[in-house]
């Protein structure tokens, strides 16, 4: 794959290379505030997966296997030769798990930020009927397919809260790119395709070789805060507690795949740990390179 097929940015000139894999539907502009604080000590690679931003349209199914392969091609094309730290958030963390099993020799360490688990299906086996209507994979797929058919103006209105949250955080030029990002029909089509393949992704990751025994940091969200957020969305407290307890168990399970792991609870943070607790992530990364 030619390097210009995927949109990327290299920021900083620090001695450690840090590659960031964003969550599903997320842009790398989200990461600018924390990247500003990291660029003195790290060379940071941000990129948009195929179908996101200015990257090419997907040419293969949106599986974590294909995503990992495409990331590897990009890193080779831009000349990343030394071992690097790979950090992933949410679904991006699932992509990181896949990459780690496919290219273990290329990694210095891994950071998983409230990552989707390879055993995510256990969440759907819980007795949480109301929440299942809210988080069902088929609902996510259907919703994004519907969004992909809307006009740009309709998508701008639909995503106005997301877009406006970037105000005063990035430049005016980048604000134009953010609006383009979230009003893209291809973005929503790609998100639907990524969700569609979660079952395949889970099986692939579990069927592959053992996880590499390299330093691993797993950061999990604050259970009490997450439960409160679910209740604010009219999810019954009992269901929210069941779900969040299982999510925490899955995070701990992720930390057990390497004997060189550290498990951290991000007190006061919801799912977007990199926005809520950047200090915690910065400290964790500094431990890795010290």
Question: What is each of the regions a protein language model found here?
Answer:
Residues 25, 49-53, 92, 117, ...:
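Alpha/beta-hydrolase active-site loop signature
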